[in-house]
Amino acid sequence: LCDKKIQLGINLTKGLGAGALPDVGKGAAEESIDEIMEHIKDSHMLFITAGMGGGTGTGAAPVIAKAAREARAVVKDKGAKEKKILTVGVVTKPFGFEGVRRMRIAELGLEELQKYVDTLIVIPNQNLFRIANEKTTFADAFQLADNVLHIGIRGVTDLMIMPGLINLDFADIETVMSEMGKAMIGTGEAEGEDRAISAAEAAISNPLLDNVSMKGAQGILINITGGGDMTLFEVDSAANRVREEVDENANIIFGATFDQAMEGRVRVSVLATGIDSCNDNSSVNQNKIPAEEKNFKWPYNQIPILETKEYASTE
């Protein structure tokens, strides 16, 4: 999957996992942080992907994000000035069947991670049921989620590297994503009549994302990709369809790129940042949580090891 892999916390974990303990994941990342930073220290942009609720993702992701935030990447421009690494978190939340405790641990991990990333995109695994049917295999469901992320992130990078009539660079990306908090990302692809509108509507209604609304977005990045047959009117209609969903004062950055492999089709990718989170849509039934537990919040570094209610009541 990647050219360079780093084993976290060799001394701490002895080659094993974190045992679903965030403190172990945190310690493993801290043990290996110098090696991690050696690989990312000169990066302009960093994507941190993790599954929240377990040990490694919940514990290690915030450590890496914090180190990246404190680092400075030397940008070789006119003044060779130093700029921080633009850090984007792309993480998942547990399935409902994984239990209340794991969901609460995930939420604590998200709170910690959000302190250090510029932009955070959250995908609840439970939302895979929105796009699955009775015949969808377990592996296929995860592949669908991976594809949404891959195409959406590619929409961001394509703006910087793909040729087009309206080209953008990293400075534009940084404007939309730096210090923006929660975000949503979506992509849609269509062909035939009204393909541009259909692609735009698919992009702004990503069923996998956490309950978030584009209405309050502070920054919007729109990338429209098509073949040589993509028309000006199609670009206009797709961009306007996305614009209708956001506040008129939002900072909208737009790009259009060409890809000969897209002949006959149009793809629209949307990244909305600085959005307000709606009610949490986790599958955990809050009515089933005892009142004393519902109002109780564990400090991030004091998440209990045992899952029993008796253990929690003694803390």
Curated annotation (Swiss-Prot):
GO molecular function, one term: GTPase activity
Entries under HAMAP family matching the protein: FtsZ
Keyword list, A-Z: Cell cycle, Cell division, Cytoplasm, GTP-binding, Nucleotide-binding, Septation
Cysteine disulfide links: none
GO annotations of cellular component type: cell division site; cytoplasm
Keyword hit for GTP-binding: yes
GO biological process, one term: division septum assembly
Compartment annotation: Cytoplasm
Known role: Essential cell division protein that forms a contractile ring structure (Z ring) at the future cell division site. The regulation of the ring assembly controls the timing and the location of cell division. One of the functions of the FtsZ ring is to recruit other cell division proteins to the septum to produce a new cell wall between the dividing cells. Binds GTP and shows GTPase activity.
Name of protein: Cell division protein FtsZ
PROSITE patterns linked to this entry: FTSZ_2
InterPro entries: Cell_div_FtsZ, Cell_div_FtsZ_CS, FtsZ/CetZ, FtsZ_C, Tub_FtsZ_C, Tubulin/FtsZ-like_C, Tubulin/FtsZ_2-layer-sand-dom, Tubulin/FtsZ_GTPase_sf
PANTHER family reported for this sequence: CELL DIVISION PROTEIN FTSZ-RELATED, MITOCHONDRIAL DIVISION PROTEIN FSZA
UniProt signal peptide: none
Chief site of localization: cytoplasm
Chain residues that bind GTP: 55-57, 98, 102, 146
Family stated for the protein in its record: Belongs to the FtsZ family.
Subunit: Homodimer. Polymerizes to form a dynamic ring structure in a strictly GTP-dependent manner. Interacts directly with several other division proteins.
